[in-house]
Amino acid sequence: MRIGNLFYEEKENGTFDIGFIEENVKVFNHQTYKLTCHLDKKNYQKFKKKIGSLDNIIKLFSDRFHVNEFNKFCNKHEIKYTHKVRIGD
C-alpha cells in the first residue's frame, strides 16, 4: 500500500516492508530515492502487536514516513529490522 511517500507491504512469507519513496530528488540528479525497512517474521509479529492495526502506521509515522520515529518505536519495543536505500528508477 502506498499513501503519500509512505509504503508498506505484508509479504506472503510473513515478513513486512515499510519505507518511503521520494521522486525527482534534486541532490540525486532528479532520480528516485527509496528507503525500505524490512522486518523478518518474528519482528513483524512484535510490530503488529505493538501498533494494534496497520491503520495506525500513518498515525505513528506519518504519510511521509518519519524514519526517526520508526527507529525510536522499534528500539523501544526491541523490534529489529534491516534497511536498504536505492537511488534511481
Regions found by a protein language model. Name each.
Residues 24-35:
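A short, polar/proline- and glycine-enriched secondary-structure boundary/capping micro-motif
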Residues 1-18, 25:
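Short, charged/polar N-terminal "headpieces" of proteins
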